[in-house]
């Protein structure tokens, strides 16, 4: 969700943003993610929200090497109260029009997308977006899932610092 916030700030106040780094960016909800959101909407008031969150974490980050990211994801979710979680979940179901706009409009701000090679839900759309937007660059980190800065922190830092140095 951080990539959505960053991009919204860039749209609203481009004078405040000189560059953007998006790790594990979400710019399109594919069929699978839309199905999961709809499924979650149906069961969110029936099952404990942490079960739903843990299930979603496993679907997004299914591999053994994603375990650290999955556990972090769930641990941070425990800080949310059920009411906050329901509000956050409702927001995700309203994202499609905003994400479509983000994909269609290049903000012309240098942007680095850092994605995990195993981020099967969100990498395909970022590949397309990086090809369409002239200001965007894509780095794909091997053996890495959705939360690239946790799965491979040293490689993530190296790639992002290199991007920032090239801008200066």
Where are these regions (language model features)?
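Conserved alpha/beta-hydrolase "acid-adjacent" motif
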Residues: 120-125
């Amino acid at each position: 969700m951080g990539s959505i916030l960053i991009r919204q700030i860039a749209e609203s106040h481009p004078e405040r943003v000189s560059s953007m780094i998006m790790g594990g960016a979400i710019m399109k909800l594919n069929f699978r993610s839309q199905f999961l959101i709809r499924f979650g909407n149906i069961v969110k008031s029936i099952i404990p929200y942490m079960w739903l969150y843990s299930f979603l974490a496993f679907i997004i980050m299914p591999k053994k090497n994603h375990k650290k990211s999955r556990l972090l994801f769930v641990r941070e979710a425990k800080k949310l109260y059920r009411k906050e979680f329901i509000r956050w979940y409702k927001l995700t179901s309203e994202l499609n029009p905003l994400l479509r706009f983000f994909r269609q409009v290049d903000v012309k701000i240098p942007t680095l997308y850092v994605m995990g090679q195993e981020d099967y839900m969100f990498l395909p759309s970022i590949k397309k977006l990086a090809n369409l937007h002239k200001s965007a660059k894509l780095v794909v980190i091997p053996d890495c899932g959705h939360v690239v800065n946790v799965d491979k922190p040293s490689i993530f830092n190296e790639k992002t610092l290199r991007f920032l140095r090239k801008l200066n």
